[in-house]
C-alpha cells in the first residue's frame, strides 16, 4: 500500500505541474510547495533557531479557523511560544501567510519520506497538531519514528473512509501516530474503536469557540446599521454562481430587502458578472471604505452591498435577519457557524452531508436546505412574513452554538499538561 500511496503522491504532483501551465492558481500552489522547505529553513534560522514549540498543519481556511482558537489560547498563556503553521491549499496560505500569532507560515511540501524528514530536521517541533482531515502518511510515519507528541483535533470520521476498508491498513496505522484524537461526535469515536484506536476524546469542534470569540469582539459598522434601518436584511456568505442562479431572482423581486453578498471569489470578471445579474442598485465594499478602514455613508438608494474583501464576512452576519451560505452546489457548504452564533437561521444547498453542524441544525430547526429557486423563495417569504417562525429558528441557531462551546479548553489542558 505504501508504494502505491507514494506513487499516487508523485502522480498528483506531476498532474499539478501540468495544470500549472494553464492555471495561475495551480501554479501558485506548485511553486509554493516547491520552495516550502527552503523558505522554512530561512525563516526558522531567522525567527526560531531552536525550533518550534508547536507545529500546526491545516488544509485551508476552514481548518485554520479550527486551529486558531487553540493557537490563540497557547499564545495567551505563553507569548514566547514559537508556532509553525503550514497549509496545503493556496487559498489558505495566501490569506493567512502573515498571521500574526504564527512565528512562521509556509506550505506543506510534497509528502515524500525525504521531504518529511527534512521538514522535521529543520523545524524540530516539540508538539504537532493536525486538523480534521489531514493524513499524510510519510509525514505521520516520520513523526512517529521520532516520537514527537502529535494530536489530531476537530476530527470527524465516516464509515466510507479508507481507514475502515479492508485495504486501508496503512492509513489505520497512521492514526496511531496521534497520542490523542479529539473527535466531534460519538459516531467517530465508535468507528475508531472498531479498528482498535482508543486514545480518543469527544470534544466537539473548536470552530464553535472561534465563532463565539468573533461574536464577542462586537465589531460593528454604524454606517451599515443606518443603511439597513428596519428593513429585512439578507446576508449571503461565500456565494458561488450556482447559489446565485437560485437566489438572485428572489432578490431582484424584493427591492425592499437589504442584501449583503460576499462572493467566495471576487476578481474583476466575477464581480462584473454579478453586477450584471443584479437588477437593483449595488455598491462595492471597496467603494465605500475610507483610507483608515472605516465605512463611509452608503448611498441611500443602495439595495445591495457586495463585499469584495477578505476578513469581514464573519462580523457582517450580525446584521442579518436570515443568511444563505454558499458552496452547497459545489464541493460543500462553507462555515455556517459564523452566522448561527448571532442567532440567525441559515439556508444552504444540498451538498452538506459531511458537516455535522448542518445535520444538527436542520434537525433542530435552525437551518434549512434548498435545491431550487422555488425552495429559496418559499423559505425567505416565510421568514419575512411569519415572525414566530423566524424567531424560533433564530433562537435555535444561537442556542446550538452556545451548547457546543468548550473544545479548545479541553484540548489545551491536555496537550500542555503532556508537553
Q: Which sequence ranges carry the predicted segments?
A:
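Hydrophobic beta-strand scaffold residues
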Residues: 148-150, 259, 282, 346
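C-terminal alpha-helical cap of glycosyltransferases
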Residues: 404-419
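Acidic donor-binding loop of glycosyltransferase active sites
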Residues: 123-127, 298-331
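Active-site and donor-binding regions of nucleotide-sugar-utilizing enzymes
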Residues: 17-217, 235, 239-241, 254, ...
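Structural alpha-helical scaffold elements that stabilize or flank donor/cofactor-binding regions
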Residues: 119-121, 174, 227, 316, ...
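Catalytic binding pocket for nucleotide-activated donors in carbohydrate/polymer assembly enzymes
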Residues: 178, 194, 313-399
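Nucleotide-activated donor-binding/catalytic signature segment of Leloir-type glycosyltransferases, i.e.
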Residues: 96, 100-105, 274-307
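Conserved catalytic-core segment of nucleotide-activated headgroup transferases in glycan assembly
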Residues: 63-77, 217-289
Amino acid at each position: 500500500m505504501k508504494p502505491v500511496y507514494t506513487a499516487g503522491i508523485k502522480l498528483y504532483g506531476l498532474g499539478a505541474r501540468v495544470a500549472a501551465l494553464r492555471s495561475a492558481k495551480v501554479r501558485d500552489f506548485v511553486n509554493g510547495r516547491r520552495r516550502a522547505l527552503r523558505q522554512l529553513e530561512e525563516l526558522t534560522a531567522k525567527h526560531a533557531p531552536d525550533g518550534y514549540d508547536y507545529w500546526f498543519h491545516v488544509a485551508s481556511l476552514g481548518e485554520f479557523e479550527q486551529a486558531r482558537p487553540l493557537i490563540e489560547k497557547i499564545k495567551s498563556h505563553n507569548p514566547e511560544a514559537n508556532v509553525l503553521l503550514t497549509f496545503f491549499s493556496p487559498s489558505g496560505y495566501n490569506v493567512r501567510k502573515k498571521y500574526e500569532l504564527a512565528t512562521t507560515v509556509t506550505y506543506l511540501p510534497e509528502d515524500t519520506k525525504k521531504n518529511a524528514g527534512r521538514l522535521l530536521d529543520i523545524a524540530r517541533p516539540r508538539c504537532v497538531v493536525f486538523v480534521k482531515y489531514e493524513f499524510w502518511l510519510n509525514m505521520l510515519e516520520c513523526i512517529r519514528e521520532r516520537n514527537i507528541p502529535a494530536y489530531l483535533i476537530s476530527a470527524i470520521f465516516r464509515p466510507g473512509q479508507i481507514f475502515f476498508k479492508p485495504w486501508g491498513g496503512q492509513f489505520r496505522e497512521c492514526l496511531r501516530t496521534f497520542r490523542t484524537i479529539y473527535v466531534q461526535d460519538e459516531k467517530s469515536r465508535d468507528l475508531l474503536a472498531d479498528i482498535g484506536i482508543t486514545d480518543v476524546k469527544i470534544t466537539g469542534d473548536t470552530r464553535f469557540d472561534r465563532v463565539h470569540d468573533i461574536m464577542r469582539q462586537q465589531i460593528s459598522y454604524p454606517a451599515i446599521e443606518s443603511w439597513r434601518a428596519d428593513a429585512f436584511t439578507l446576508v449571503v456568505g461565500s456565494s458561488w454562481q450556482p447559489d446565485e442562479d437560485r437566489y438572485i431572482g428572489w432578490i431582484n423581486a424584493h427591492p425592499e430587502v437589504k442584501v449583503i453578498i460576499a462572493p467566495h471569489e471576487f476578481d474583476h470578471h466575477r464581480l462584473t458578472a454579478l453586477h450584471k445579474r443584479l437588477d437593483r442598485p449595488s455598491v462595492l465594499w471597496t467603494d465605500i471604505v475610507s483610507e483608515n478602514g472605516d465605512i463611509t455613508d452608503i448611498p441611500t438608494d443602495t439595495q445591495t452591498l457586495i463585499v469584495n474583501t477578505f476578513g469581514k464576512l464573519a462580523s457582517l452576519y450580525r446584521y442579518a435577519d436570515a443568511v444563505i451560505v454558499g458552496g452547497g452546489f459545489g464541493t460543500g457548504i462553507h462555515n455556517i457557524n459564523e452566522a448561527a452564533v448571532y442567532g440567525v437561521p441559515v439556508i444552504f444547498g444540498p451538498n452538506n452531508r459531511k458537516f455535522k453542524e448542518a445535520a444538527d441544525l436542520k434537525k433542530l430547526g435552525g437551518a434549512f436546505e434548498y435545491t431550487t429557486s422555488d425552495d429559496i423563495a418559499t423559505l425567505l417569504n416565510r421568514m419575512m412574513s411569519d415572525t414566530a417562525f423566524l424567531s424560533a429558528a433564530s433562537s435555535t441557531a444561537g442556542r446550538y452554538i452556545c451548547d457546543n462551546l468548550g473544545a479548545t479548553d479541553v484540548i489545551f489542558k491536555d496537550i500542555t499538561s503532556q508537553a
